[in-house]
Amino acid sequence: MSRINREEFARLMQQRVLVLDGAMGTCIQGYNLTPDDFLGGKGNNDILNLTSGDVIEAIHRAYVAAGADIIETNTFSGNAISQKDYGMENRVREINLKGAQIARKVADEAGRKVLVAGSMGPTSKSLSLSPDASDPGFRPYS
């Protein structure tokens, strides 16, 4: 396993620029995935860790082959608030664990030091912005 501590990470960053992978969601769009792959919740890319792990693994491998030093887990929306939109809030732990395992496997098999970073995006809810463009004053919370 290619785990490093904070000091080693700082040393690596002083030696050279570390390359982070690119957009997971954009790459996913290039695959012919069906609603079944998303368990009916098209757009829930994180659930693909469970249903189409081979696709996520292939994307990670492509980024490593392109020279990425750091790959991010496919867990951008892996939180209970965002997953509730798809009825998957009870699978958050499973989604995140599998996402980390897939990335870790690819990093370990890279033949060079590749780091894994956990990806944590915002939730699908906003207190400061209206989710409805036609009603900018609307807030889903009172």
Locations of the language-model features?
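Domain-level signal for soluble alpha/beta catalytic cores
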Residues: 1-142
